[in-house]
């Protein structure tokens, strides 16, 4: 634990680590206070593409936690940055929330439902049969298929909801084209997170609640990994995977010793 506390940078997942639904998880406030007090570099990194950093900041504020907007990085931002680096000034047909559309717009990517360079799928309420059909036809005409993340499901207060991978699957199956996923566990998103923090992977830790995304992302990017049991994964689930986190904790409150 002392080795973890000496890390200069912390990349933290959000849902299941910081909050669940609209409820702040135990020990989180003390953990964030510790990050500030110890002058740690930290980033809340989420595979969700629906909300902007400003909206995430406001959500935490409503829960009584004040964190600067600069500490948030989403798969929408990662996707927009990736596409802009590949084809600056390109166009896209998008199925997703406002956070994704805003991120793409800020990178100079225009919306196009006739002959786009890319079809980009995120999460949101805009998903229906008509836009699936349009996406299929555009991909068959040559548009490249991008998913903001490869999560099959996401957490909800009353269970789970379909996430990006589940929503993009019909388009992949109908077109025979495999999507490229930008978010975790793609090391691309993690490397960008480390650059934002200004730390080397050996000086940072990845904290998350999912073995299939958070822990893989950390391991493949060279970070120490910390699995918290405050989210989707139970201790008995860990043995199902061929890899292990460096530490397993009940929650982030264990890191500064809140529960000790």
Predicted region positions:
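Asp-based, Mg2+/Mn2+-dependent phosphohydrolase catalytic module
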Residues: 1-12, 17-37, 51-73, 80, ...
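Conserved phosphate/oxyanion-binding catalytic-loop motifs
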Residues: 48
């Amino acid at each position: 634990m002392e080795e973890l506390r000496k890390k200069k940078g912390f990349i933290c997942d959000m849902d299941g680590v910081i909050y669940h639904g609209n409820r702040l998880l135990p020990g989180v406030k003390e953990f964030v206070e510790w990050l500030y007090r110890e002058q740690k570099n930290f980033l809340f990194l989420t595979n969700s593409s629906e909300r902007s950093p400003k909206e995430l900041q406001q959500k935490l504020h409503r829960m009584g936690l004040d964190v600067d907007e600069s500490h948030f990085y989403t798969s929408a931002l990662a996707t927009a940055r990736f596409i802009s680096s590949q084809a600056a000034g390109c166009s896209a047909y998008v199925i997703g929330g406002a956070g994704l559309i805003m991120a793409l717009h800020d990178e100079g990517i225009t919306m196009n439902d006739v002959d786009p360079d890319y079809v980009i799928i995120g999460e949101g309420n805009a998903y229906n049969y008509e836009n699936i059909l349009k996406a299929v036809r555009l991909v068959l005409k040559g548009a490249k298929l991008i998913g903001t993340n490869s999560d099959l499901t996401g957490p909800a207060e009353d269970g789970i909801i379909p996430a990006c991978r589940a929503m993009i699957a019909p388009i992949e199956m109908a077109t025979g084209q495999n999507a490229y996923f930008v978010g975790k566990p793609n090391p691309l998103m993690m490397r960008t997170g480390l650059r934002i923090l200004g730390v080397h992977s050996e000086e940072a830790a990845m904290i998350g609640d999912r073995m299939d995304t958070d822990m893989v992302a950390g391991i493949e990017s060279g970070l120490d990994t910390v699995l918290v049991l405050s989210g989707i994964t139970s201790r008995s689930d860990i043995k199902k995977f061929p890899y292990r986190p460096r530490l397993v904790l009940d929650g982030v409150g264990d890191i500064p010793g809140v529960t000790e």
